[in-house]
C-alpha cells in the first residue's frame, strides 16, 4: 500500500509512505535480530545528520554570497548608498559569516568525534549540530531575502526555495526539540550520580 505526498521543501522530490500488512521475514533475513531495526536505523542517522548539516552550511554560504553581491550591486542604490551600507546590513553580513564559521566548526568537531570514538559517544555533538546548522542557514537565508526585497521571495533567486528546504530540514531525522532534549539529557547526565 503506497501513497505519495509532497510538502514544503519537497520541490524536487516526492516521498512515499508505505504500509506493510501481514509481512513475514524469514529468520535468516533478519538484520541483527528481531526487534533491532531501530538500532540499525539509529546507527545510520549520525552520518546522515552530518550530511544534512553540511548541506545547511552550503546553503548558508550561497545565501551569504547572494546577500553580499546584492549589497554592493551598483544598480541597487537607496539614499545615495549601496544596500550593504543601509540599516543593519553590515551587521547581518558579519553575523552571517560568524555564525557560518561556528556551524562549520561544530560540524567538523562532530565528524571528527564520530570518526575517532563512534556515533554513540558523539551523540550530543551530532544533536547540537542538527539544531544549530539548519537554524543558522535559515537566519542567513532570511537576511538575504530581506536585502533582496520582493525579489528574494520570487523565483528570480533560489532564496525562497532554499528557505523552504532548510525549514524542512529542521524536521528531518527528528525536530529540533528532540535534539535539544538529547543535548540537555547528556548535560544533566554529567551531574547525576
Each predicted region: which residue ranges?
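Active-site/binding-pocket entry motifs
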Residues: 24-26
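Single conserved hydrophobic/aromatic residue that forms the stacking wall/gate
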Residues: 1-12
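Cytochrome P450 core scaffold surrounding the K-helix E-X-X-R motif
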Residues: 29-34
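Alpha-helical interface subdomain recognition
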Residues: 17-22, 36, 43-193
Amino acid at each position: 500500500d503506497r501513497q505519495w505526498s509532497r510538502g514544503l521543501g519537497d520541490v524536487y522530490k516526492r516521498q512515499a509512505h508505505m504500509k506493510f500488512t501481514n509481512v513475514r521475514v524469514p529468520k535468516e533475513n533478519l538484520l541483527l535480530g528481531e526487534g533491532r531495526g531501530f538500532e540499525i536505523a539509529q546507527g545510520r542517522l549520525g552520518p546522515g545528520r552530518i550530511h544534512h548539516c553540511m548541506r545547511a552550511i552550503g546553503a548558508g554560504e550561497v545565501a551569504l554570497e547572494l546577500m553580499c553581491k546584492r549589497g554592493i550591486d551598483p544598480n541597487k542604490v537607496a539614499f545615495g548608498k549601496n544596500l550593504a551600507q543601509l540599516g543593519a546590513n553590515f551587521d547581518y553580513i558579519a553575523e552571517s559569516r560568524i555564525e557560518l564559521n561556528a556551524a562549520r566548526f561544530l560540524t567538523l568537531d562532530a565528524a571528527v568525534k564520530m570518526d575517532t570514538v563512534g556515533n554513540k559517544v558523539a551523540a550530543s555533538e551530532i544533536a547540537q549540530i542538527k539544531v544549530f546548522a539548519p537554524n543558522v542557514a535559515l537566519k542567513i537565508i532570511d537576511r538575504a531575502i530581506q536585502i533582496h526585497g520582493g525579489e528574494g521571495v520570487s523565483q528570480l533567486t533560489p532564496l525562497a526555495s532554499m528557505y523552504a528546504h532548510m525549514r524542512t530540514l529542521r524536521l528531518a531525522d527528528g525536530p529540533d526539540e528532540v535534539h535539544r532534549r538529547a543535548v540537555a539529557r547528556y548535560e544533566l547526565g554529567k551531574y547525576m550520580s
